């Protein structure tokens, strides 16, 4: 089961079990409608948490979970990550994709010959960088329009006309 990080529980608020969550998603408004999460220090050891009440304020989500009704119980959740399954991810608008959907995608050069395969996506301060496995080497390509001409999700390929410049 693939799990995807949506937020991190920072600390409790008040005495009734409310927790402050840092959203790590482009869709923080989904915290208002999502009814459950899988919570844990990692995606390998998670437990289900059902949401009783949710609100958003100043860039944070504030959540009450079923069975978490004291400060002590809420403190035990501090530092845990909130995950959802892939089927629960928000649909992306046309022309957009989740980063994990790009892993394994073919990279074509300007002549439309296969040059490599995306093996990872690195998050850098300015933009993401595609790590491409090509002929046993790792090639890093900035994820910007200047270098990436086309991404075809249906065909599972990306066109990088200036690929040779990265060799």
Curated annotation (Swiss-Prot):
Transmembrane segments: none annotated. One of its GO terms (cellular component) is ribosome. The keyword Iron does not apply. InterPro entries: PRC_barrel-like_sf, PRC_RimM, RimM, RimM_N, RimM_N_sf, Transl_B-barrel_sf. Keywords: Chaperone, Cytoplasm, Ribosome biogenesis, rRNA processing. One of its GO terms (biological process) is rRNA processing. It comes from the Bacteria. Residues 94-166 form the PRC barrel domain. One of its GO terms (molecular function) is ribosome binding. It is found in: Cytoplasm. Pfam families: PRC_RimM, RimM. Binds ribosomal protein uS19. An accessory protein needed during the final step in the assembly of 30S ribosomal subunit, possibly for assembly of the head region. Essential for efficient processing of 16S rRNA. May be needed both before and after RbfA during the maturation of 16S rRNA. It has affinity for free ribosomal 30S subunits but not for 70S ribosomes. PANTHER family: RIBOSOME MATURATION FACTOR RIMM (PTHR33692:SF1). HAMAP family: Ribosome_mat_RimM. Belongs to the RimM family. The PRC barrel domain binds ribosomal protein uS19. This is Ribosome maturation factor RimM. The gene is rimM.
């Amino acid at each position: 089961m693939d799990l995807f990080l949506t937020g991190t529980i920072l600390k409790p608020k008040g005495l009734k079990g409310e927790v402050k969550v840092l959203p790590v998603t482009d869709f923080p408004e989904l915290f208002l409608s999502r009814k459950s999460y899988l919570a844990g220090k990692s995606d390998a050891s998670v437990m289900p948490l059902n949401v009783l009440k949710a609100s958003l304020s100043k860039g944070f989500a504030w959540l009450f979970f079923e069975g978490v009704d004291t400060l002590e119980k809420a403190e035990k959740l501090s530092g845990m990550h909130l995950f959802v399954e892939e089927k629960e991810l928000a649909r992306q608008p046309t022309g957009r994709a989740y980063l994990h959907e790009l892993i394994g995608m073919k990279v074509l050069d300007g002549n439309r010959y296969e040059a490599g395969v995306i093996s990872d996506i690195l998050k850098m301060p300015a933009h993401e960088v595609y790590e491409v496995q090509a002929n046993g080497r790792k090639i890093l390509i900035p994820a910007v329009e200047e270098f990436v001409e086309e991404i075809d999700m249906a065909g599972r390929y990306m066109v990088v006309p200036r690929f040779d410049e990265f060799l």
